[in-house]
Amino acid sequence: MKLKSVFRSVLKYRKTNLSLLLLITYSIITLLYIFDHERYKLNLPKEDEHPEFNDLLETAWGDLQIITASFHPYTSKENDKVHDYLLKRVLEITGNSSFASVSDDKESERSILFQQQDPFNESSRFSRVTYFESSNILVKLEGKNPEEEGLLLSAHFDSVPTGYGATDDGMGVVSLLANLKYHIKHRPNRTLIFNFNNNEEFGLLGASTYFNHSWSNLTKYVINLEGTGAGGKAVLFRTSDTSTAKIYQQSVKENPFGNSIYQQGFYSRYVRSETDYKIYEENGMRGWDVAFYKPRNLYHTIKDSIQYTSKASLWHMLHTSLQLSAYVASNSLDTADQMPACYFDFIGLKFFVISAKTLFYWNCIFLLVSPVVAIGLYLISRDRMTWKSHSWLSWTRFPLSLAAGIIVQKLFSNDIIRSNPLTFSRNYFWPISAFFTQVIFTSYVLINCSNFFFPCADMKSLSIIELFIILWTILLFTSKLLYSSDYRYTGLYPLSIFFLLSTIAAILRLLALALGMRTRKRLGRECRDHHSNYSSHSQIDMERDGQENLEQPQDQFTSSQDDQASIQDDNVSTTSAGPSHNVDEDHGMDSSSQQHDERVPLLKGSNSMEEGLSTRENSLKLEYTDYAWIIQFLLIVPIPSFILFNSVDVIMDALNHTVQEGSKATFDVLRFGMVGSILMALPILPFFYKVNYITISLTALLFLISASKTLLVHPFTNSNPLKVRFSQNIDLSQGNAASVHVLGREGNFLKPMLQDLPSIKYSSTHINCTSVTNGMELCMYDGMQPNLLSTNGNTNISSMAKVHVLHNNRNSTERSPYEPIVAELLLDVKENRACTLTFESRHQAKSPVREITVYQKKNSAPQKTNITKTIKSASGINELQLHKLDFDQETYHIGVQWFPKLLTDGNLEDDKLGTKDELSVSISCYWGEYDSESVVNGTAVRKIPAFDELINYAPLSFSFTNEQKGLVIVKDAIIL
């Protein structure tokens, strides 16, 4: 009996049990979170257990060390060294394989001229034409069944000028080498193409060039390996559809990691990055974008190096891609379901997939069926007189307390914006914790205050039913979003899971009421009618929250008394119904005077209830013990809390550093934090009003700590630095001054840092800082001259880039006024790989340029003759981007054709000055090497000393990246 008594005591709905269960729940969630984030580090292959995998990892790590020895952007000579190393490794791996072929774009001098929308800004209406000379390395492994649609594996080997490219994208490249080595030993069934591509960073150009290769016709599927962060785990960033998501599910059995929340966030442009996957997808391929995604404040900086990553991260990407490629290469694929997919993993152990369209259909079923069932059960309970009527004060306290919590949260967010808007960049846990504790603490205070003055003995059940109504409304809204987005809002699935579990809990309560015994209820009402002169507390409903009327034989009566007595001390109410009595939710009775026997009158001082009971009822013990609350708790709290916490963590982990990219991103992150914390609070709100004083005290303490950390702690540290963008601009039309541009977030961060630089501090150099769009600040000052070239004389920066007009017939008398104007330019640019020409007419709203010609010098052509590539555009061309491989080729030869104003608007007007058809051409050329030296007059000097100074003297709470495709930009302008 004692064991039974203890068991019943543990299951009682009381403060201690509830608080303990909450503690256990959140402890388990914390342990699962830690397990999820640390487990992959312990799964490295061991030489004695998996010798082949261990060899692949060790070889890949060695390759990564060599590739990331220096910065290697497309605009650098080191880029060629990486290309040559990869080509050597590819030839070593393929050897004399009978089914392997290698193609080197650099050797074949492959180039493309094509019109391209800005891949990093889909809203841009700027018409761009790009000329690109490729050095992609492609490998073809012909499959045993070459008629099957092939698989492309792709990664880019260029880095940005300011990063070593360990994760972006060195790990992807060496993972491709490992995959190549594996599939050489295990010949695939379908044909595999490996694309080690170049110049992803400045236009996704290597991927674009792939479709100029004949092998592109062999592939239908793609695995793209990328790095948009700087380590951690490689996530399934996005995938084409439900079929490809299920292929990932079937193939990646060990450490799967993916979430369609990332996919929705990426397509919604909350992340200002793009990968080669975009190009492959636009060209009709289906597949998987696997990428590192955090931390973004180290992404594209000097800390994207092998020192800041690990073998565990490399193995996670390598093993994921290997599992996926091996499955696709060797199995028939079911690719019928091409609807967008909702998917997620459970702590790296299990991967779940559902079609977004199927989820929408289930949402519709839930939305239709759940209110019908709920209303039906309500009507049954009303008809059977088991429904307990409640005042409007009881019904409104839960939603009003939630609304009050949201208002308090909004007020606190205003304080964050005023005092520390970038706090999310350092640690998003503290603001999320502050928002979360505000909501639950406010709800606790308001509900218990209202219960003090207007007691409600069924608060939990009312709250669960109202939570069901709130979630029904939310699900209706999100389902509409899912439908209107053509099922691309794939990150909304957590709300469907939450709604389903909460609905089950609410319906269980309604079902208990509908099936409950009526006799007790009727007699209780009769007694209340006979004793209406008693105090107001006697009108309280005698059933406690969630109680069931259970008939038990008389021989259990004594044990029931013992059970009740054993827990008497804990059966007090969460609130008092006045100074003289307490309402006990567990019993629905005045606990100060109750006896643990059903024969005691339900109304204080009255024996009429006992007199009114029938002989049968007198022989039965009706036990008012609520054990159903545990089922409700387990349905509503643990699983939804874990899923919602994980979803919020996924969002914040990917976006928290984007607050450095502008005020819009800051408000987005703040909004996600607020909404996410509300969703995290919803599962526990129906229960939280009943926690004990220790729990609520800890909640208040956690809020105070979180609020102080959020508002008072500096947002940037050595490990979480502020990322600043650098460029040095030399405008030859304005002189030779080398103006340094430093771009970063507003907030008095940049100028104090710059004022402490030696070249500024000791020369009184003026720093001009101005606010630019989107909450960013641009600081400019005259910096030290760059040394881009080795020379034996004085460096003349104006000799770095010159423009020669070879031909221009604008003012030719032989040209008809209706005839397009033609000009030829020769750009003389030394040791350069990238330039941009921008076209503008002062007299025409749109660019009048309709045709661009690029004259190439082909080394393989007879006597290195020129070969032309021409592109036309009826809508006009605003910009021409030029990318060439040969540093020794010092010229770009360009032809431009544009329409006179007469052709574009048909207005024949006098042009006495002869300027209406003028075309302004702005030229910008880029140099991206800084971690190297030039020899000037026999002395070794650093190429970009202004950038070196920032790296050497700025506090460690700053990190630096390039503002444009080069660190030094030489500009000029002419009028044609």
Curated annotation (Swiss-Prot):
Pfam family for this entry, one: PFF1_C
Highest taxon, organism lineage: Eukaryota
Source species: Saccharomyces cerevisiae (strain RM11-1a) (Baker's yeast)
Name by which UniProt lists this protein: Vacuolar membrane protease
Binding site for Zn(2+) 2: D168, E201, H300
Membrane topology, Cytoplasmic segments: 1-15, 381-392, 450-461, 518-627, 690-692
Regions of this protein lying in the Vacuolar compartment: 37-359, 413-428, 483-496, 649-668, 714-976
Keywords: Glycoprotein, Hydrolase, Membrane, Metal-binding, Metalloprotease, Protease, Transmembrane, Transmembrane helix, Vacuole, Zinc
